[in-house]
């Protein structure tokens, strides 16, 4: 929780000071009401009707002032807590947005969602309650104790202490039972989100294998654990409310019994003053107990908020793998990419996933990567836009080491189409114009035509205003890929990266789209990862990868004769005649 306090703004502290000031006003008028009750009680014994009316009118004024102070406290408490939660959520979102791929691997998507929503909401609610009571409880308690000292009665004081000790003992037991379980509830909440998200995103596979019962059983195991834990915590906290009422009523009855015991046998004229003063004592004792209850409630809520704050702190204090340089340099070239003996190892791995990768691409050229699954193709291209940093060697874009350029500047010159096409909820126009919302409809249509997407978009009733579901689930795989390609093309970058982005297209459309890109963006450098040899045959350079090593570099015509790995891949897809090879693969 210390992290949250460190991030308070001066406005937050000013509001907290205002809460403190109005709390003093509230407690003052609360004590005045108790004093007035005593004065009215005395007036009924020895005063006049005028005195009673006068004190009654003063009590009404005190009650109104106390209510106004409480309303103002609620206003500042709610506003300050909301401000703290808003700042936390904004900072959390910014931090996660800066994460590299390796950073995201350390936190599951479900956990990050839970932390940014449920955890921050728990902190928000804890602060609302804390701001309402953190000053009221101790100030009321101290003020009441001071007044009790003035009207001290040893038996009544001891009675009050006994009930307070009982209350504290029960609370200590309650906290010992409940506190350790708060951390478990948050972890189980993460697990519930994982199970729910997995079932929803994989719904087609689940139904195809008739695995609904299996998925339900998996969910039920986690749900049962979470339910059992929450029932225990809920029961423990639920028992606290009636116990408070028991303490309050028990204290009042005990004090009245002590009073009756003390005045028993005394003369009425002698007993009456003590009985009347005991009324104020009972009210003050009740205020002390209520103050304890408020503090205890905070103590119950606070541990859960602390667990949530610790989870937020884990993310906020996480050291990001990819950072901007202190001083950025300008590009010296345009549309060039160069790898110099580049190697990359994933965090926690001693062995490099790729090593000794060297090549150079000039502006307007096409370089392609091919290799078996897990050979390191995506790992290599992830280092171009700095989704990950090389652990050895240098990656240069436009003549400059990518580590010496701000990530924003670097990515401004790169258009990236991922392996799995992803579209954002909204409409087609917004998705294609994702890099620049100010693109005209004509520019959007041109990009769609290059990606061969204009035909199916124009066939829709709303055309480019047609709705897009989250993730683009209302489009086929091929349509989704073409829209993603159009999004990259619309950016008109210096470098275009296609991470197996033609895999869902038929051979004819694949060839047309690549030709459109080459003709429509002649000065753009193209980086292509593909599994199909037909997609990369016309590339200026082809990098052949095998188990993280570069085993071939050149044109298709050269590699098909002198690179066994490339030849093996090619022959698995096309015949020797189609590849222009003689019988025997020569």
Describe each region flagged by the PLM.
Residues 11-28, 32, 129-185, 256-268:
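Transmembrane helices of ABC transporter permease
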Residues 29-45, 53, 62-109, 113, ...:
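Juxtamembrane helix-loop junctions of ABC transporter transmembrane domains
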Residues 331-586:
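ABC-type nucleotide-binding domain
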